[in-house]
Amino acid sequence: MDEPEDLGGTDASMNPVEALLCALGACQTIVASAFAPAHDITFEEFHIELEGDLDPDGFLGLADVRNGFQEIRFVMHFKSNEPKEKLEAFAKFIENTCPVGDCLTNGVKLVLSGVAID
């Protein structure tokens, strides 16, 4: 993990919020692959295009805005001969089934359970 140079990093790899987007896309891809046969869906290729809005001024304490993403958008790309309506219904299933998406949509209770000094 890294951060851009203007945030003190070297910009050599993805930052944690980019990893969050990757986790969402990877989870959706796994759901698509795992459940396609049960939905009688075939595709040659599948990928997710993701982007999100994040104001770094919140993280930096420069503005009273949320520290994390305000919105995440994604497009599911199928290379398939299936009808568009069938793929749209399957995309909705993927969106509703993905555990990472569920965490982002419904929130997760984060609990600091202690501090350890090693």
Language-model segment annotations:
Residues 1-22, 33-118:
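Extended beta-strand/beta-hairpin segments
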